Curated annotation (Swiss-Prot):
CDD domains: S14_ClpP_2. GO terms for biological process: protein quality control for misfolded or incompletely synthesized proteins. The gene is clpP2. This is ATP-dependent Clp protease proteolytic subunit 2. Its EC number is 3.4.21.92. The keyword Cell cycle does not apply.
Amino acid sequence: MPIGVPKVPYRMPGGQFTDWISIYDRLYRERIIFLGRDVDDEIANQIIAVMLYLDSEDPGKDIYLYINSPGGMVTSGLAIYDTMQHIKSDVVTICVGLAASMGSFLLAAGTKGKRLALPHSRIMIHQPSGGTRGQATDIEIEAREILRIRHQLNQIYANNTNQPLAKIEKDMDRDFFMSAQEAKEYGLIDRVIEERI
């Protein structure tokens, strides 16, 4: 039976009364964002809005993005990525569980030196997938677009990991799983968290 979104007590600074708010709202107040599902337009818009708000509230103060995601839509993930690069605040990315596909892309997109993973996390990279129906010309247009996106993602991964583009292209041809330590050696993250942060 689903338990719904947990609620926790919270008292506004200087406030007299305690109120019950969602755990996610409470985490936002600590500059913590949790991506715990597929990346789609809805969750991307929420994450982008929170990042923009937190950055405007206290520019330059770290924002923490915890990731436990199997991936999702490329366009939605790129929107989050662009926002991470746009804001003044550093984005600390932390893999808890699984960062696969677009989840690993966002993990690697954190501020260099601040990309982390818990010891038993799994990270997976692969090429984007897509499907289309329709006339042959429509399928050809879609195929060209997915190849363009694949090249764009490969270039960003190469930049974020310092791996040669040819290696990224080879490794992303199929599902490529890594442990947290292997992801560190690959350059996707900077540190495996062994102690509390």
